[in-house]
Amino acid sequence: MAKQYDSVECPFCDEVTKYEKLAKIGQGTFGEVFKAKHRKTGQKVALKKVLMENEKEGFPITALREIKILQLLKHENVVNLIEICRTKASPYNRCKGSIYLVFDFCEHDLAGLLSNVLVKFTLSEIKRVMQMLLNGLYYIHRNKILHRDMKAANVLITRDGVLKLADFGLARAFSLAKNSQPNRYTNRVVTLWYRPPELLLGERDYGPPIDLWGAGCIMAEMWTRSPIMQGNTEQHQLALISQLCGSITPEVWPNVDKYELFEKVELVKGQKRKVKDRLKAYVRDPYALDLIDKLLVLDPAQRIDSDDALNHDFFWSDPMPSDLKGMLSTHLTSMFEYLAPPRRKGSQITQQSTNQSRNPATTNQTEFERVF
């Protein structure tokens, strides 16, 4: 067994012992993430341990896909894969060596920043965050890659204020359907609260609009400080989407009745679209409201794409996008969702945010309850 694992681990990879682990900063179904530093140079990195537990036939295909995609993507707003390291198989690790993906270290993730009441984004800074996020999406989509897990926790920000799309564990290449043969991608992707309605209805021939829906959820979250639709089940998530974006019908979404689950799930009837009405108490800027409204369109064919979103008046009206470095320089501690206190389900944010100045929704608490 040891020999088998040693052969599937890259034999030309360095030992991970060249790095010293400093702290765990993330954990999930994907494995664990650690902050670490290079023992000789002192360079700070993030080590993502590849989960091997259920892989009886060698290296996980999902990890191979992630590595291949990250080696392809080189952009300021996409996380940078430095190298791949390993530990050798031995009796001490049940003859299972480990693989680590080594990334440039980013000091924060967006979910961690939004969880802290002391972090206050101005409207200009929100514009810069969304501009970088959409730039990253534009780049990966131009390179025919879908992220498929857009959420605030997967948006990293460096201490210099540079945003990086991260966690490409669910990402995949996409292509336009050819010869009337639709693609058959899995629809069991994207964290539930950020999952678009087409995936919830069983669509398997999808494309970049699924990531733009997530971008819309994240953009609204910049003001609400909380995921805006927190369903407990897929059925519940569809109900929340209908309550915000209007009932899902063929009148507003042509051919939606052709989706596999359209007749099988109970869809809320008689709901009017009220994205702007529901969010205007938080989002005071009319251009911001309009862009969120265009990102959270039910029909993926009518949902705004990253190119048009970047040309939206939101980014070209006063105040213009401004650098995050100054604001972040006042926060010396890294902020990650994993390190934030656990949230109590069911509580509501009642504060309203102007974000026109450094005085968004605040309370006497140190942390926001991230429930909208």
UniProtKB/Swiss-Prot annotation:
Q: Where are the stretches annotated T-loop?
A: 166-191
**What PROSITE patterns does this protein map onto?**
PROTEIN_KINASE_ATP, PROTEIN_KINASE_DOM, PROTEIN_KINASE_ST
Q: Which organism is it from?
A: Bos taurus
Q: How is its activity regulated?
A: Activation by Thr-186 phosphorylation is calcium Ca(2+) signaling pathway-dependent; actively inactivated by dephosphorylation mediated by PPP1CA, PPM1A and PPM1B. Reversibly repressed by acetylation at Lys-44 and Lys-48.
> Which PANTHER family has this protein been placed in?
CELL DIVISION PROTEIN KINASE, CYCLIN-DEPENDENT KINASE 9
Question: What reaction(s) does this enzyme catalyze?
Answer: L-seryl-[protein] + ATP = O-phospho-L-seryl-[protein] + ADP + H(+); L-threonyl-[protein] + ATP = O-phospho-L-threonyl-[protein] + ADP + H(+); [DNA-directed RNA polymerase] + ATP = phospho-[DNA-directed RNA polymerase] + ADP + H(+)
- Chain positions found as Phosphothreonine: T186, T350, T354, T362, T363
Name of the protein: Cyclin-dependent kinase 9
Q: Which residues bind ATP?
A: I25, G26, Q27, G28, T29, F30, G31, E32, V33, K48, D104, F105, C106, D167
How does this chain assemble? Component of the super elongation complex (SEC), at least composed of EAF1, EAF2, CDK9, MLLT3/AF9, AFF (AFF1 or AFF4), the P-TEFb complex and ELL (ELL, ELL2 or ELL3). Associates with CCNT1/cyclin-T1, CCNT2/cyclin-T2 (isoform A and isoform B) or CCNK/cyclin-K to form active P-TEFb. P-TEFb forms a complex with AFF4/AF5Q31 and is part of the super elongation complex (SEC). Component of a complex which is composed of at least 5 members: HTATSF1/Tat-SF1, P-TEFb complex, RNA pol II, SUPT5H, and NCL/nucleolin.
Disordered, as annotated region? 343-372
